[in-house]
Curated annotation (Swiss-Prot):
InterPro entries: Ribosomal_protein_uL29, Ribosomal_uL29, Ribosomal_uL29_CS, Ribosomal_uL29_sf. GO terms for cellular component: cytosolic large ribosomal subunit. Belongs to the universal ribosomal protein uL29 family. Transmembrane segments: none annotated. CDD domains: Ribosomal_L29_HIP. Gene3D superfamilies: 1.10.287.310. It comes from Xylella fastidiosa (strain Temecula1 / ATCC 700964). It holds the Pfam family Ribosomal_L29. This is Large ribosomal subunit protein uL29. GO terms for molecular function: structural constituent of ribosome. PROSITE patterns: RIBOSOMAL_L29.
Length: 65
């Protein structure tokens, strides 16, 4: 997802999406360890989406409402 798509979401949606992304990342890491995962570029995509969501959550908490 693009950061613009994340900006339209609420804090609760972002937190839920972050949990989903972390589960997906864990699953991918386990598949890589077992040698079953071939699309390694997906790991990078998930890692960057996690960073985007974490940035937005910290930005929201930092700015006064």
């Amino acid at each position: 997802m693009d950061i613009q798509q994340f900006r339209g979401k609420s804090v609760d949606d972002l937190k839920a999406h972050l949990i989903e992304l972390r589960k997906e990342q864990f699953s991918m890491r386990m598949q890589v360890a077992m040698g079953q995962f071939q699309k390694t570029h997906e790991i990078r995509r998930v890692r960057r989406n996690i960073a985007r969501v974490k940035y937005l959550l910290s930005w929201i908490n930092r700015t006064p409402a």
